[in-house]
Amino acid sequence: MARATFDMNAAGLEARGGGHTEHGPLPFSVESLLEAERVPGSESGELGVERPLGASKPGAWPPPVAHSCPPRAPSPPPCTLRKHKTNRKPRTPFTTAQLLALERKFHQKQYLSIAERAEFSSSLSLTETQVKIWFQNRRAKAKRLQEAELEKLKLAAKPLLPAAFALPFPLGTQLHSSAATFGGNAVPGILAGPVAAYGMYYLS
């Protein structure tokens, strides 16, 4: 009785399944995992090819290109021009009264002795070094002015005509020699008048 019931159940299952039974792979079986890892192919039906991990996906941005910086131009050599000294002492600002006293003293005497310089600097509330340097600069200025005046005198003393047009001897000597050569006759040109007058004065 039990065997007949089992046969009927088996026959019913076969009738429902079309005469045979198929069982699909379980969701956690090895076949299902392998099917999930496969990559679908392209539209032409080709199977997908597995790409390495570092490969870029289709349609992604290309990797940035590293731009090499241009070489820097060499720095110019340091300037070798002579620079003014920064530790130079500032010029002494003399007052108007001090300058007038220094000028009067310079016109009296251009060179001061040590005692005179000490006394004079003390009267002006200046140091001996300041008075000494002022007299040195004033003497140099006086020398430049004197040389400029001499140059002006030399330029003023030069003749207006060049040396080629200067007469080698006085005009009277030339006229006397011309009259003696031609026997008192008049010479054509500019010598006619003076020679004739000279001859008439000599004959009278």
UniProtKB/Swiss-Prot annotation:
Cellular compartment(s): Nucleus
Q: Which Pfam families match?
A: Homeodomain
> Which tissues and organs express this gene's product?
Restricted to the dorsal embryonic central nervous system.
Q: Where is this region: Disordered?
A: 39-89
The UniProt regions of compositional bias labelled Pro residues, in chain numbering, are 60-79
What is an example of a GO molecular function annotated in this UniProt entry? DNA-binding transcription factor activity, RNA polymerase II-specific
Q: Which GO terms describe its biological process?
A: negative regulation of transcription by RNA polymerase II; regulation of transcription by RNA polymerase II
PROSITE patterns for this protein: HOMEOBOX_1 (PS00027), HOMEOBOX_2 (PS50071)
Does this UniProt record's set of keywords contain Nucleus?
yes
Which sections of the sequence are annotated for DNA binding? 87-146
Cite a GO CC annotation. nucleus
| InterPro entries documented for this protein | HD (IPR001356), HD_metazoa (IPR020479), Homeobox_CS (IPR017970), Homeodomain-like_sf (IPR009057), HTH_motif (IPR000047), Msh_Homeobox_Regulators (IPR050674)
> Which PANTHER family does the entry link to?
HOMEOBOX PROTEIN MSX (PTHR24338), HOMEOBOX PROTEIN MSX-3 (PTHR24338:SF9)
Query: What does the UniProt function comment say about this protein?
Result: Acts as a potent transcriptional repressor of MSX1.
Q: How does it assemble?
A: Part of a complex composed of MSX3, CREBBP/CBP AND EP300/p300; the interaction with MSX3 decreases histone acetylation activity. Interacts with HDAC1. Interacts with CREBBP/CBP, TBP and SP1.
Of which family is this protein a member?
A: Belongs to the Msh homeobox family.
Q: What is this protein called?
A: Homeobox protein MSX-3
From which source organism is this entry? Mus musculus (Mouse)
Taxonomic path: Eukaryota, Metazoa, Chordata, Craniata, Vertebrata
Q: Which gene encodes it?
A: Msx3
